[in-house]
UniProtKB/Swiss-Prot annotation:
Organism, scientific name: Methanothrix thermoacetophila (strain DSM 6194 / JCM 14653 / NBRC 101360 / PT)
The family this protein is said to belong to: Belongs to the archaeal IMP cyclohydrolase family.
Pfam families: IMP_cyclohyd
Protein name: IMP cyclohydrolase
SUPFAM superfamilies in the cross-refs: Archaeal IMP cyclohydrolase PurO
Amino acid sequence: MYVGRIVAVGCSGDAVWVGYRVSSRSFPNRRATASGSSVFVHPVDPSDVLKNPYITYPCIRASNDFAVVSNGDHTDMIFDRIEDGSGPLDAVALSLVAYGYERDDLRTPRIAGVVSGRSAVLGIAAHDEIRVRKIELQDGDAWMVATYEKTGFEPVSMEGASASSIARSLFGLPFERPVCSAAAFRRDDGFELAVYNPR
């Protein structure tokens, strides 16, 4: 099954995490790169951006207290609104309403997630609906939403005790055409970031 981009949130022990995976048919030559407290998805060939403006973006941004994950530039808006005092649910909802779905041929949904404390928020903006849900996380929980097929908020079997292991676990989910993945994992002093690029 091809599900496109995947946003995941979860909890391992006392640590919450977010994860992101690129699965792609059209632009598989992409990588995830960590820089500071953010992870960026970008094409190997920068000129590919001229063919599709949606293929490069910050997929994860983290502060000491929360982490945001999404499949587009709305990562920044969600992060900034939470920094300015909005709750995660409101920040995700407002940002998805503001951005809407991607204006490409497939009308690709925008998806997003936030973890803060022991709570998570997942959201999706499709061409015909916008949905946002708050989830209270328990140890071992993992939830996902994807751009195609798996567009509901559903539990997924994943585990890991670090950003690196979460990124690899997400990459290994049994969905077609994985390209790269990334994760942010809560530590005592903030969020640890990791990326997985198999080639």
